Regions:
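Short beta-strand segments enriched for Tyr within beta-sheet-rich domains
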Residues: 111, 189-196
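Single conserved hydrophobic/aromatic residue that forms the stacking wall/gate
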Residues: 1-12
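Conserved beta/loop motifs at nucleotide-recognition and modification sites
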Residues: 13-61, 65, 133-142
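Phosphate/ribose-recognition catalytic cores of enzymes acting on nucleotide-derived substrates
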Residues: 171, 197-250
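Glycine- and acidic-residue-rich catalytic/RNA-contacting loop of pseudouridine synthases
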Residues: 51-74, 108-113, 127-179, 229-230
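Short, solvent-exposed secondary-structure boundary/capping segments
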Residues: 176-183, 205
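Residue-level signal for inorganic ion chemistry
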Residues: 10, 46-47, 68, 100, ...
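Glycine/acidic-rich beta-strand-loop module
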Residues: 75-116
Length: 250
């Protein structure tokens, strides 16, 4: 019993040591970064799928913010816990692509205003289920929490949720799926995923929104095996933040 208690105590101690000393503390970690551009004011990184952007409940370590803190730890006067520097925007854990990080308070203020005023250019590539018939289009629909499933967002009536606009363009039709380019006019949580589902074209392998269930009921064994192999190759929603345009703050 004594040994068992000591073991539990050791586990509890390790868990407590893994947590930050206070709620918002960022712990620098040596996690590789794919840096696309960097100067003394900002840097742009290509985030891989599967990497959580910001520490939170259950994800105190191993996030993009922890990696940024390590990369910038030798900059004079840099404080990883200063909200006036760091990430300017976010993308989902299982979405890959470009993010801009501000190194100075002035840069973060300037970039933040560009996002607020919707002057940035954000283009995504997405693989969606089905044959998207229109070559291009615009989806307008307020986005908010799904009252039937709080883990999902959904399109809501005009008097609910937040105004959201997504422009899309077909790049290539590939039979059962379509490759599209999506341009965000607004930046709501899960916006592209929700809007594409709203028009009947859920993202390929988007587990949260049913993009992994497309094979249910099919009797075509070879096709089913082929798609399952594709799921193994792309084990997350097929969404990539490909282009990020903004005016340099200096």
């Amino acid at each position: 019993d004594r040994l068992r208690s000591r073991g539990l105590g050791d586990v509890y101690k390790r868990q407590m040591m893994d947590r930050p000393r206070y709620e918002n503390e960022v712990i620098p970690e040596d996690i590789p970064l794919d840096i696309v551009y960097e100067d003394k004011y900002l840097m742009v990184v290509n985030k891989p799928a599967g990497l959580v952007v910001h520490p939170g409940h259950g994800n105190y370590r191993g996030t993009l913010v922890n990696a940024i803190a390590w990369h910038m730890k030798d900059i004079p006067d840099y404080d990883a816990n200063d909200p006036h520097v760091g990430l300017v925007h976010r993308i989902d854990k299982d979405t890959s692509g470009l993010l801009v990080i501000a190194k100075t308070p002035d840069a973060k203020t300037n970039l933040g205003l560009q996002f607020f005023n919707k002057t940035t250019k954000r283009r995504y590539r997405a693989l969606v289920w089905g044959n998207v018939e229109q070559d291009e289009g615009t989806i307008v629909g307020n986005v908010g929490r799904n009252p039937k499933d709080r883990m999902q967002m959904t399109v809501l009536p005009d008097d609910q949720g937040k105004h959201a606009v997504t422009h899309y363009r077909v790049l290539e039709r590939l039979g059962y799926v379509t490759l599209v380019e999506c341009v965000l006019e607004t930046g709501r949580t899960h916006q592209i995923r929700v809007h594409m589902k709203h028009i009947g074209h859920v993202l390929f392998n988007d587990e949260r929104y049913g993009g992994h269930e497309i094979l249910k009921g099919t009797h075509f064994a070879k096709y089913k095996q082929f798609v399952n192999n594709c799921f193994d190759t792309c084990p997350r929603q097929a969404l990539h933040a490909m282009t990020l345009g903004f005016v340099h703050p200096v």
